[in-house]
Amino acid sequence: MVLALSAYAEHLIEGGLHGGLTYWDATTVYVNHQLDFHGGAHLYYSYLAPHILGIRAGLTLDRHNVAFSMQDYADSYSTIDVNNQQMDISYTISSLRETYSIWSVGLPLQAVLFYRQFSLLVGPKVVFPLVCSWKQTVNHAALSVYYPDYENFIEESYPLAASRDFSMENERRLSLPKVQWWLATEFNYAFTINDWARNYRSYIIVGAYFDYCLTSITAAASNSQSLLMLSDTRDGLPLQRLFTPIIEANRQGQKLVSDGGLFNIGIKISYAIAPFKPHKEAYTTCHCYGN
């Protein structure tokens, strides 16, 4: 005798791993997007009502990596030095690369449409970013410095690194919006491993998913000026633009990266069990064949 899955309600507990590609969906100026990877773990509870409908809630832990790069970039800005004098600084960068590593916890709630071993899930997912680590690598940068009060152009200055070729790295943590709303979709196929032989049903579930962040993401403003400390001098190098993350930075009043969201595409694999065997009545009312 074979029992149809839709003949009775079923509770599923599912746990597994997922991973794939991440992309930052935003308009950029002078900046190149780069596909990167994400991955994580998930734990779900599903209630599958008789016939074809159900609901699923769960908990996910994710890590997203996002990358940007720029080539042959130039900009200028004004700042105030330690003597309260205005400095006009122009700089060029041969290449720059930034990476963002974001850890987050998600709470999805999805409607389930299923037929036999196939299932389609759609619903919202609330995401809480935990940590966002940022790393910036600058290669072959050069500066020129001008003091307008004295009409003095600094052609060579070791403490200011004027007219020098240098490279550097900067790392710190950024703050993202505390709550993000995502739309989570998923398509699965379930392989039955155990069919009530031990009073529970078990599955291996494989699937593909597409998640899109509906909340515009931008990093919280950081310090307006950071100092690069040179190894053999006590003076610092004021690099406001170089030490500003790309997703915060402006060039002549225009943001390099517009506020945007992430989207993920990937695959998942899970082990699931239905811990409660259907009541006896289910065997008499289900659609079945055989003896």
Where are these regions (language model features)?
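Short loop/turn motifs that connect adjacent beta-strands in outer-membrane beta-barrel proteins
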Residues: Y8-L12, L48-I55, T192-V206, F276-G290
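Short glycine/proline- and aromatic-enriched beta-strand/turn motifs that initiate or cap beta-hairpins
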Residues: Y8-L48, S270-F276, Y289-N291
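Outer-membrane beta-barrel proteins
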Residues: D25, L43-H51, L113-Q117, F187-A197, ...
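Extracellular/periplasm-exposed beta-strand and loop segments of Gram-negative cell-envelope proteins
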Residues: D25-Q34, H64-I102, P129-Q180, S216-N264
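Extended serine/threonine-enriched, polar tracts that run as long, contiguous segments within proteins
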Residues: R164-D165, R173-D195, R201-I205, Y209-T218
